Amino acid sequence: MVKQIESKSAFQEVLDSAGDKLVVVDFSATWCGPCKMIKPFFHALSEKFNNVVFIEVDVDDCKDIAAECEVKCMPTFQFFKKGQKVGEFSGANKEKLEATINELL
């Protein structure tokens, strides 16, 4: 299941409550073609990796989070463990997304 983040406090709450679990963040926008293309795959990964927390942040709705996380383009995927960023890449690369999750588990 993918959780939609609506506020900076909700974002921080997910990072804090994840504990030792990996958190994968999809920074996207409704107008972004590649974001729409990879979204079903991101949701499928959330079913496959049920020990990983998957969240989506709309950069237009949550500009403060996008700015704080230094998101420059969409989609950007960031990976957090124990509240710390442990990985990041940009672009709708399905293979890289799944490989990065496997690597960080």
Curated annotation (Swiss-Prot):
The keyword Transcription regulation applies. In the fully reduced protein, both Cys-69 and Cys-73 are nitrosylated in response to nitric oxide (NO). When two disulfide bonds are present in the protein, only Cys-73 is nitrosylated. Cys-73 can serve as donor for nitrosylation of target proteins. SUPFAM superfamilies: Thioredoxin-like. The modification S-nitrosocysteine is found at residues 62, 69, 73. The modification N6-acetyllysine is found at residues 3, 39, 94. The modification N6-succinyllysine is found at residues 8, 94. Residues 2-105 form the Thioredoxin domain. The active site is at 32 (nucleophile), 35 (nucleophile). The record marks 26 as: Deprotonates C-terminal active site Cys. GO terms for cellular component: cytoplasm; extracellular region; nucleus. It is found in: Nucleus; Cytoplasm; Secreted. GO terms for molecular function: protein-disulfide reductase activity. Disulfide bonds join 32-35. Its main location: nucleus. The record marks 33-34 as: Contributes to redox potential value. GO terms for biological process: positive regulation of DNA binding; response to radiation. Keywords: Acetylation, Activator, Cytoplasm, Disulfide bond, Electron transport, Nucleus, Redox-active center, S-nitrosylation, Secreted, Transcription, Transcription regulation, Transport. Participates in various redox reactions through the reversible oxidation of its active center dithiol to a disulfide and catalyzes dithiol-disulfide exchange reactions. Plays a role in the reversible S-nitrosylation of cysteine residues in target proteins, and thereby contributes to the response to intracellular nitric oxide. Nitrosylates the active site Cys of CASP3 in response to nitric oxide (NO), and thereby inhibits caspase-3 activity. Belongs to the thioredoxin family. PANTHER family: THIOREDOXIN-LIKE PROTEIN 1. Homodimer; disulfide-linked. Interacts with TXNIP through the redox-active site. Interacts with MAP3K5 and CASP3. Interacts with APEX1; the interaction stimulates the FOS/JUN AP-1 DNA-binding activity in a redox-dependent manner. This is Thioredoxin. It comes from Oryctolagus cuniculus. The lineage of its organism: Eukaryota, Metazoa, Chordata, Craniata, Vertebrata.
